[in-house]
Each structure stands twice: as structure tokens, then as C-alpha cells.
């Protein structure tokens, strides 16, 4: 099925659309399943090799139709918001867990084996203590979003053992880059901060700003996902996707100011329930399994984002 399409769920979103550009450039056929709740049809190119299906991964029959005839699946679709999962755990569970189960079942029935899954560093909770967490760090999900991601990982490994699926599970840390919509309530901190800096609007920081994140540029992630589609064997076990480098929000703001020529006023608000204090990836397994491209440095990535 070398000419068969690659299905990307959530493909109209930030990460998915960047991946699709790269897949089309490689000559692949691509199929997208996206309900456009946060993704945008305008993120996708007008290309005869791209088939778009509008709908949710929570719709089992639609997922079955989308998976049929594909050679692999990249499962990115999710309600990617900690706060949304806290406010509506039942609703977000449909996309964030039931959607994964629907993908697994559709793949089993269609005989499709390779699946790339976007899990999250949120599965570790606050177990980092400021240091880099490896994949064996005890899991302590603090929110329904994190719990759904961890449960999805377990189901994917079950389908590996029982039905021969080949899941490549990636625990994304903080991915950023072009097309990350700053107006979305689910957007990442970098896109929100950079947009407000460009417009001269005050920037709100929850807490003291010394909380840290491991930021990873989207083009570097796309390179890894492309490799994972084609490696002969997908080894068992999730893989952290990060740089093993922690950046505080205060340092991030300083970098944005340096790249954009200045910062508007910064207002500190009370820390939010469920927010993780420190998050940094031990990426030894990533470097062992995949060819890591030269990492995009923060200020270079910010400059690309600001000019996009």
C-alpha cells in the first residue's frame, strides 16, 4: 500500500498542517479527519493529493471510513486544553480517549498497523521536581486531559500486543511554531505571548513566571514524525519529545522582547489549579531511536513565528 494515503487526524490544526506540508512535499497521498473545532481549513493547501473529511474522531463509523485504505495513521486529534478537560471532563473524554479507541478499532478492522500518537508530558504531573523526566518517571496525571492521554497509551500498547498494531507513542512537551492560533483558548503560551507583544497588549502570567517548560519547534517535531512513519520497527514504549532544556516563562518573555524589540507590561496573576510547575524532557530515548535534526534555538524559532 505504498501509494495508499496517510491519515492525519486533527490535520487542520497547528502540528497536523505542518506535518501535512512535509508529507505532500515527500510525494505522499494524505487524508485528513478534522472537525474544525480548533483547526482551520485554511491551514491546508489546495492539493489534489489531499482528501479532507470533516468530522470528529468520537464518531466511530466516520473514523472507520477515514482509516479504510490507509497505510498509516497519525493521531493528533484532541481537545488540547487542560482547562477544557477540567471544565468538561465528559465532553473532552470523547475526543481525547474514545477517539483513540475508535482509531485503534478501525485500524484493527482495516488491517492498518502503523500509528503515531500524540501523547503529552502532562502524564508526569508534577513529578519532575525541576529536573528532566525520563519515560519511566512515575505517572501522576493531574487533569482529565492527562489521564485520557495516559489511558490512550495503555490501550495502544494493548492493541500492539493483542492485534499487532505498531504504535509510536510520543509525549510532546511544549511544541510551538507557525499556525499556532493565539486566539484559541487551547493555544500555547508562546503564540499568545508573541501576538500580544506584536500588538503592544499587556501580557498575563499565571504565577511568578519561574515555572519552566521544555519548548520544541514544530519543524523539528515534523522531522521526527516523518521518520517514525517509515522506520522498519517501532520499539515498544513512549518517547519524550523535548530538548532536555528548561526555559522559565520569565526567560521566554525576555527572549520575545529581544526578538520583537520590546515588551508590553507584564501582569502576574494567581497560579491556576492543575498547572504543572516544572516540565523538562530527558530525551535520551528520542536521540537513540531517531535522527534528531539540529535543534532550532529559541530566538530563531521565535523570529520565524513572528515573521509567519
Model-based region annotation:
Residues 1-173:
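N-terminal Rossmann-like NAD(P)+-binding domain of SDR-like oxidoreductases, especially those catalyzing
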Residues 19, 225-229, 253-256, 283, ...:
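Hydrophobic "lid"/C-terminal helical patch
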Residues 29, 49-51, 166-168, 202-204, ...:
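Conserved beta-strand segments of alpha/beta enzyme cores
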Residues 107, 160, 197, 205, ...:
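Hydrophobic pocket-lining residues that define ligand/cofactor binding sites across diverse proteins
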Residues 150, 175-191, 201, 206, ...:
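Glycine/proline-rich active-site loop of Rossmann-fold NAD(P)-dependent oxidoreductases
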Residues 151, 155, 159, 189, ...:
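Hydrophobic alpha-helix immediately C-terminal to the catalytic Tyr-X-X-X-Lys motif of short-chain
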Residues 218, 250-251, 269-294, 300, ...:
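Conserved C-terminal active-site "lid" loop/helix of NAD(P)H-dependent oxidoreductases
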Amino acid at each position: 500500500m505504498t501509494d495508499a494515503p496517510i491519515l492525519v487526524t486533527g490535520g487542520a490544526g497547528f502540528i497536523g498542517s505542518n506535518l501535512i506540508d512535509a508529507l505532500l512535499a515527500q510525494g505522499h497521498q494524505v487524508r485528513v479527519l478534522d472537525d474544525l473545532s480548533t483547526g482551520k481549513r485554511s491551514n491546508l493547501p489546495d492539493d489534489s493529493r489531499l482528501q479532507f473529511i470533516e468530522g470528529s474522531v468520537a464518531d466511530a463509523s466516520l473514523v472507520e471510513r477515514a482509516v479504510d485504505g490507509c497505510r498509516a495513521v497519525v493521531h493528533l486529534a484532541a481537545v488540547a486544553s487542560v482547562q477544557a478537560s477540567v471544565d468538561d471532563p465528559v465532553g473532552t473524554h470523547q475526543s481525547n480517549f474514545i477517539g483513540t479507541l475508535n482509531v485503534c478499532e478501525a485500524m484493527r478492522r482495516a488491517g492498518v498497523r502503523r500509528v503515531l500518537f500524540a501523547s503529552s508530558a502532562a502524564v508526569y504531573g508534577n513529578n519532575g521536581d525541576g529536573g528532566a523526566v525520563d519515560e519511566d518517571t512515575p505517572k501522576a496525571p493531574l487533569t482529565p486531559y492527562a489521564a485520557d492521554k495516559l489511558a490512550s497509551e495503555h490501550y495502544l500498547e494493548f492493541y500492539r500486543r493483542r492485534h499487532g498494531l505498531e504504535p509510536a507513542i510520543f509525549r510532546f512537551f511544549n511544541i510551538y511554531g507557525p499556525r499556532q492560533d493565539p486566539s484559541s483558548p487551547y493555544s500555547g503560551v508562546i503564540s499568545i505571548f508573541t501576538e500580544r507583544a506584536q500588538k503592544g497588549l499587556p501580557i498575563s502570567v499565571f504565577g511568578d513566571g519561574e515555572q519552566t517548560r521544555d519548548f520544541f519547534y514544530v519543524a523539528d517535531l515534523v522531522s521526527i514524525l516523518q521518520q517514525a512513519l517509515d522506520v522498519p520497527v517501532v520499539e515498544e514504549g513512549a518517547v519524550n519529545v523535548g530538548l532536555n532544556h528548561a526555559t522559565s516563562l520569565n526567560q521566554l518573555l525576555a527572549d520575545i522582547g529581544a526578538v520583537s524589540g520590546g515588551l508590553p507590561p507584564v501582569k502576574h496573576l494567581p497560579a491556576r489549579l492543575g498547572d504543572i510547575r516544572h516540565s523538562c524532557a530527558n530525551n535520551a530515548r528520542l536521540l537513540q531511536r531517531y535522527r534528531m535534526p539540529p535543534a532550532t534555538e529559541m530566538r530563531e524559532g521565535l523570529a520565524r513565528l513572528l515573521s509567519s
